[in-house]
Amino acid sequence: MLLLARCLLLVLVSSLLVCSGLACGPGRGFGKRRHPKKLTPLAYKQFIPNVAEKTLGASGRYEGKISRNSERFKELTPNYNPDIIFKDEENTGADRLMTQRCKDKLNALAISVMNQWPGVKLRVTEGWDEDGHHSEESLHYEGRAVDITTSDRDRSKYGMLARLAVEAGFDWVYYESKAHIHCSVKAENSVAAKSGGCFPGSATVHLEQGGTKLVKDLSPGDRVLAADDQGRLLYSDFLTFLDRDDGAKKVFYVIETREPRERLLLTAAHLLFVAPHNDSATGEPEASSGSGPPSGGALGPRALFASRVRPGQRVYVVAERDGDRRLLPAAVHSVTLSEEAAGAYAPLTAQGTILINRVLASCYAVIEEHSWAHRAFAPFRLAHALLAALAPARTDRGGDSGGGDRGGGGGRVALTAPGAADAPGAGATAGIHWYSQLLYQIGTWLLDSEALHPLGMAVKSS
């Protein structure tokens, strides 16, 4: 039965993508034929991203020098790619040693160089440094940085070489010298800690039958507080976890508001709804205008990556007003980072939205288009409903037919789908859901690289 369901889902996903490809979509890279990108060479002394190398937005902090006798030496792997020339002036093979992430990016760059300039190869002049020839806390000491040129040493090519390094996925690229380009990557554990789109296990949701529940304890049949596309509160079925890692230690963005005082933790690539500038700070989102939080339209609230939310912007929180519960915009007071070891969980509801710690968030991550992500999961929701209909004897544990709409604010209650526990992926299996992995893979084929958050999904190095 599950195999059949997966086959049906694949067919539906393909149909959905074909249809969307014929349309002119609202997002970057959507609904249009991808043309070869025009690459612009970096200028001398330019670096991308435009932040310091050892900051969160680039390659991250220095984690300590690696020597041949240290425990961390096993983190380094030799690169024997025949398409790369290693200078290795020390004759120790040190320049070939690097982290797996650095190796993957370097190998990708080698292919780009050969495609850009036939007959020319990538040349590495400096890799891992064990002799202390670089500045203090240089990432060369960790095997996370390389200095590169082209094999013909044609300096007129170096600006474009730097651009190719950016496109290959290096986390920081610097046209450092007229003689070479400097590239570096994040630490392996740093990438894993910051990747994905999740909430910590300590986050809470509101249940239809009253009370709250830790997000890590959600199970099929639970109905949790969410919002529709007009910003009205309702209860929606919890379907599955798109990602679940009980033992994860993650870096979360901490979004805090003061009036009312709320605190939400979520990973960098997760989507959070932000109110437009003309949305009254004291009023409810107007249903008549279609400007409710989940719409993501140009004039209404939009969903942003958590890493892009800034103090002064306004998010939607649940507040009591005139004895009624409703969504109100609240100004973000601070955005900080916190490392938590409470696990990481990405719940999916039928509505595609969820109230976490009384703050409205999307169920989706990786791509900054909530509406498109929700459409992409339509086949999954359909399969879930079909399988539920095939097992009418089973009922949801979270259902309470007499509960009505306890969310207030004129909200609507979604119908409970019996047999939800039998839906594909409804169990609490650890790891990333197979459907999410499928969509991510398709997205990497169809979308521009800028459309996907760089920390959207932790991908194992090959």
Curated annotation (Swiss-Prot):
Coiled coil: none
Keyword Endoplasmic reticulum: yes
Binding residues annotated for Zn(2+), in chain numbering: 140, 147, 182
Effect of residue 115 to K: In HPE3; familial; in the mouse sequence shows no change in activities at different temperatures
Organism superkingdom: Eukaryota
UniProt-listed SUPFAM superfamilies: Hedgehog/DD-peptidase (SSF55166), Hedgehog/intein (Hint) domain (SSF51294)
Region named Disordered: 279-302, 395-414
Binding-site positions, Ca(2+) 1: 89-90, 95, 125-126
Result for mutant: residue 424 to A: In HPE3; familial
One GO CC term, this protein: endoplasmic reticulum
Residues spanning the signal sequence: 1-23
Result after altering residue 391 to T: In HPE3; uncertain significance
Listed result of changing residue 236 to R: In HPE3; familial
Protein family membership: Belongs to the hedgehog family.
Clinical condition linked: Microphthalmia/Coloboma 5: A disorder of eye formation, ranging from small size of a single eye to complete bilateral absence of ocular tissues. Ocular abnormalities like opacities of the cornea and lens, scaring of the retina and choroid, and other abnormalities may also be present. Ocular colobomas are a set of malformations resulting from abnormal morphogenesis of the optic cup and stalk, and the fusion of the fetal fissure (optic fissure). Holoprosencephaly 3: A structural anomaly of the brain, in which the developing forebrain fails to correctly separate into right and left hemispheres. Holoprosencephaly is genetically heterogeneous and associated with several distinct facies and phenotypic variability. The majority of holoprosencephaly type 3 cases are apparently sporadic, although clear examples of autosomal dominant inheritance have been described.
Record note on quaternary structure: Interacts with HHATL/GUP1 which negatively regulates HHAT-mediated palmitoylation of the SHH N-terminus. Interacts with BOC and CDON. Interacts with HHIP. Interacts with DISP1 via its cholesterol anchor. Interacts with SCUBE2. Interacts with glypican GPC3.
Protein's UniProt name: Sonic hedgehog protein
Native organism: Homo sapiens
Species classification: Eukaryota, Metazoa, Chordata, Craniata, Vertebrata
Gene encoding the protein: SHH
